[in-house]
Amino acid sequence: MPRQHAIEDYRNFGIMAHIDAGKTTTTERILYYTGKSHKIGETHEGAATMDWMAQEQERGITITSAATTAFWNGKRLNIIDTPGHVDFTIEVERSLRVLDGAVCVLDSNQGVEPQTETVWRQGDKYKVPRIVFCNKMDKTGADFYKCLADIVDRLGARPVAVQLPIGAESAFKGMVDLVRMKALVWNIDSAGAMYDIEEIPADLADKAREYREKLVEAAVELDDNAMAAYLDGTEPDEATLKNLIRKGVITGAFYPVLCGTAFKNKGVQPLLDAVVDFLPSPLDVPAIKGTDDKGNEILRHADDKEPMSLLAFKIMDDPFVGTITFCRIYSGILQSGTGVVNSTREKKERIGRMLLMHANNREDIKEAYAGDIVALAGLKEARTGDTLCDPAHPVILEKMEFPDPVIEIAIEPKSKADQEKLGVALAKLAAEDPSFRVSTDQESGQTILKGMGELHLDIKVDILRRTYKVDANIGAPQVAFRERVTKRVEHSYTHKKQTGGTGQFAAVTLIVEPSEPGKGYEFESKIVGGAVPKEYIPGVEKGIESVLGSGVVAGFPVVDVKVQLIDGKFHDVDSSALAFEIATRACFREALQKGKSVLLEPIMKVEVVTPEDYTGSVIGDLNSRRGQIQGQDMRGNANVINAMVPLMNMFGYVNNLRSMSQGRATFTMQFDHYAEAPANVSAEVQKKFA
């Protein structure tokens, strides 16, 4: 079957925002006006079409990025809903990775909030073209012009208004379209479906001219001919201006800013027009880079004629279909029943059912093309970030990077039946979410869950209980400490064991030293002249790696260490890889002690937004948690306090802050770096764990 929509008519985009900026409501309205959703789901009633997991409906925050296909003005929109809570930024990164553009939703009353900065930085990292929608213009305190200033001050970006609000707060009734120089005024009776195009109100005429001039000047900077014509007094016509704005968005020269209120159904259709007019198609963004099976860099262009390649960006467990893998097709054509190769894992797979997803109903399809976002049922091996491709033309597309978890909890199933269910459930959850890890504590035998924050783990436990019906006891959250050596040492160790017949013999000399933070573990063999035969070097590495997981201070993983094997001795008969592994293990442990190993603790970047009355209490409380205040500024009438605080002192902070500020202060927290723990903390941790 031939392609139904030309690839230049595709818009693969996401909606990104701070929690509560109205992102899910905006997505809902888009689905409603594009005819895919028959009734509007309200987030605060827990019924939004996109928020389809029970946990999301209760909390009113979006957790999983559902992918939905809709149509507007003959263009095909593939919308990825992204979570706005800081514990789920991994989901945001994952969806930004496969998008061509994004709509950044701001709360007009709050402007740029902490999580907006986080998702904006992630958008910068993946060079995602963006437009900005100032939502909630009907709210008390809504201020479109403050949002423009915030984008400059807090995001360091260049906003260009393409609309101006008509009225604000309860008097907000529409906007001035600066491209057409007309007023769009919403009809009160039509639930937002109808608006009138009118002349610009007289009291806004001067402001409209001023902002129109700024818009045109930003646009003509991108084209010499348009600039020359403009300097001669000729403004670009509507089609040229739209093309120039589109060019500005795609090159990242500026970010068009629109306004509206999704909840009150004003401004959604012009936002859809802007998505179509200004955001890129798959042809407007650079071809994706990959490597072939020989390690050479190759490109895959958005073209049906190129070999098929797709990237798995989300794995979900569906009660009706089983495991669903969401994929972005970067090149070629994919047919159901085709054999593909998972080049990341070197495994063969067969494509079973192919589905197009609307928030949570599905349509079976037989063929999908470059630019499509599809859900594949029945893949057994695929994990998030894997490449699937044509077996005749193998390629591994750019990999996604996932941060290490910083918080962990122990979980104990209550019965044998729960134990079995838990194993299956955890394997599925870990496959769905790469920032969630599962391990077994070697000494206690407990199952340990690791995640990005308290909320992240709360939700995983909730899913275990609800979806998988696992009854379990949950331990108190524990901090993921690390250990690191602080000085360079050279150390030798000889392992000798003689018990009749063949003995064991190996001697090694290691240099152990700290490497740069974030460098991880590095090993280098400096052996010359065969002091340690080549075949025993893997035994040496194995010995080091067996200690890395459990250091000498309190048994935590050792990070940022460089180990060099510089000398050794062996015996023709008694030496073996195992003997060298045993010798190295003992040598490395002693070297870590000699090298003054210290305990590292995760330090979180905390931002508290509080009414001024509570500032003193908040700062005093953060100081008592060993926090270091980095700075304060005003945001509207609230005080914003930035601090670096050890994670171990932040447990239960949400309840403390709530009671301290009568529920009026909010905070966000994300991992920033590891730092050496003070001696008293280290001693306390050693007592508990060593």
Swiss-Prot record:
NCBIfam families noted in UniProt: EF-G, PRK12740.1-3, PRK12740.1-5, small_GTP
Organism, as annotated: Nitrobacter hamburgensis (strain DSM 10229 / NCIMB 13809 / X14)
Subcellular location, record wording: Cytoplasm
GO biological process terms on file: ribosome disassembly
Name used for this protein in its record: Elongation factor G
Role this protein plays: Catalyzes the GTP-dependent ribosomal translocation step during translation elongation. During this step, the ribosome changes from the pre-translocational (PRE) to the post-translocational (POST) state as the newly formed A-site-bound peptidyl-tRNA and P-site-bound deacylated tRNA move to the P and E sites, respectively. Catalyzes the coordinated movement of the two tRNA molecules, the mRNA and conformational changes in the ribosome.
Similarity remark: Belongs to the TRAFAC class translation factor GTPase superfamily. Classic translation factor GTPase family. EF-G/EF-2 subfamily.
GO CC annotations on file: cytoplasm
CDD domains: EF-G, EFG_III, EFG_mtEFG1_IV, EFG_mtEFG_C, EFG_mtEFG_II
Domain tr-type G residues, every copy: 8-283
A GO molecular-function descriptor: GTP binding
SMART domains documented for this protein: EFG_C (SM00838), EFG_IV (SM00889)
Pfam families to which the protein is assigned, alphabetical: EFG_C (PF00679), EFG_III (PF14492), EFG_IV (PF03764), GTP_EFTU (PF00009), GTP_EFTU_D2 (PF03144)
Source domain of life: Bacteria
Record's keyword annotation contains Oxidoreductase: no
UniProt keyword annotations, A-Z: Cytoplasm, Elongation factor, GTP-binding, Nucleotide-binding, Protein biosynthesis
InterPro entries: EFG_II, EFG_III, EFG_III/V, EFG_IV, EFG_V, EFG_V-like, EFTu-like_2, G_TR_CS
Binding positions (GTP): 17-24, 81-85, 135-138
PANTHER family for the chain: RIBOSOME-RELEASING FACTOR 2, MITOCHONDRIAL, TRANSLATION ELONGATION FACTOR G-RELATED
